[in-house]
Design a protein with these regions (language model features):
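Conserved NTP-binding catalytic cores of kinases and kinase-like/nucleotidyltransferase enzymes
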Residues: 1-100, 200, 214-220, 339-372
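An alpha-helical support segment within catalytic cores of ATP-dependent transferases
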Residues: 21, 26-27, 143-148, 158-201, ...
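ATP-binding pocket architecture of kinase catalytic cores
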Residues: 49-155, 161, 167, 171, ...
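Active-site activation/catalytic loop segments of kinase-like enzymes and analogous catalytic loops
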Residues: 163-170, 234-271, 285-305, 317-325
């Protein structure tokens, strides 16, 4: 079914947004006006509603207020996923003027839910293998010049959220001149690590919460929340998947998956590094960039956008950042800063954090084989 563009639908702007949705549905579906109920919301201003029609069929309405959200990137990336044969919501109707998209309904079973229902690591692993295949498909479909570049300017803007929103706003923590200089040096290291990597399509939030198990397609994994996709570092989506905002993996399991991905990527002629130790370090430093950024983003969501659910996950990112910064001598100043922050604000068990991954320091492929 081709996408239908809807134009010149005038809504009563004096109504609240839910009343506008009701009015819009009556105009678009005059012979079968669906009921609508909240399906989900995300960290942006977008909301999603499940539309239920008289025959009990369902669709999803994306509500993206045009003064706050731009639907065009979602439409562009949706087309890229379709061409790459990656399952994602199909777009039926588009109303850019009012900020509404009608999408296919993938169901209610997310990968995050499915993982949490499995107690056995082997069963969890079985759920992850098809997701790696999706990531490989996405990267193999990459072409320069289509998506925005994930360049040094964007990376630096993201990293600056860490001192602005996490250190200053959340912790009321004032950096000394030397700490500011040291942090900027770390930022430059992380930026160079990212921009020097081979470039592919990057979902930019490729994590279990953004993978659905499609109820209309034999529970095959489908990708959602892809509108922020860019062209950037090959390790970004991989580390987003296994060093997640809401789920932590034992490092032995994580490492096994990273090696599996690396081997498959090499075999499929993706531009990964030939040396796994080099690839692993790129992966870890890319993860650190993401985690410092997310510490800032979660605080901004709390203080600016009044979304309080994210703040409770800050300790997970402190753990990630401490473990990585402890491993590499060039990150020792960041590690010292994180120790200072932890001692004053978080009181996490530092020895437990460090020892949980100590056997993987300075890792190469051959040494990994001792642990599997």
């Amino acid at each position: 079914m081709q996408k239908q563009y809807l134009n010149n639908i005038s809504l009563n702007t004096s109504q609240d947004r839910n009343e506008q949705i009701s009015q819009w549905l009556e105009i678009v579906f005059p012979n079968n006006v669906p009921k609508f109920e909240a399906a989900s919301a995300d960290a942006s201003f977008r909301r999603f509603f499940r539309l239920t029609f008289s025959d009990n069929s369902t669709k999803i309405l994306m509500d993206a207020p045009p003064d706050k959200e731009n639907c065009q990137p979602f439409i562009l990336v949706s087309d890229l996923l379709l061409k790459a044969d990656i399952l994602s919501p199909q777009i039926f109707q588009i109303d850019l003027q009012n900020g509404f998209l009608v999408l296919s309904d993938l169901g209610k079973i997310g990968l995050m839910l499915a993982l949490n229902l499995q107690e056995d690591n082997y069963e969890k692993s079985l759920l992850m293998h098809p997701v790696l295949e999706i990531l490989l498909k996405l990267q193999k479909s990459s072409k320069a010049g289509i998506l925005p570049p994930y360049d040094a300017k964007m990376l630096r803007r993201e990293l600056n959220l860490f001192p602005e929103w996490f250190l200053q706003k959340h912790l009321n923590f004032a950096l000394s001149d030397k700490e500011t200089q040291d942090l900027n040096a770390v930022f430059e290291l992380l930026i160079q690590n990212a921009v020097q990597q081979p470039k592919v399509f990057v979902h930019r939030d490729f994590m279990p919460r953004n993978i659905m198990l499609s109820e209309s397609d034999d529970l095959n994994p489908a990708v959602i929340d892809f509108q922020d996709a860019v062209y950037g570092p090959i390790t970004y989506d991989l580390v987003s998947l296994f060093r997640d905002a809401f789920l932590s993996w034992d490092e032995e399991i994580e490492l096994d998956f990273v090696i599996r991905f690396w081997e498959k990527a090499k075999n499929q002629n993706l531009p990964v590094r030939k040396d796994f130790g080099f690839f692993w370090k790129e992966y870890e430093l890319m993860g650190l960039q993401r985690h410092l950024k997310v510490l800032g983003i979660f605080c901004r969501l709390n203080y600016r956008d009044h979304k309080e659910n994210y703040i409770k996950d800050l300790p997970r990112f402190i753990r990630y950042a401490m473990k990585t910064s402890h491993r590499y001598s060039e990150l020792r100043n960041l590690y010292a800063l994180l120790l200072k922050i932890n001692e004053k604000h978080f009181h996490l068990d530092v020895a437990e954090i460090i020892n949980s991954g100590s056997k993987f320091q300075n890792l190469d492929f051959d040494s990994y084989m001792e642990y599997v």
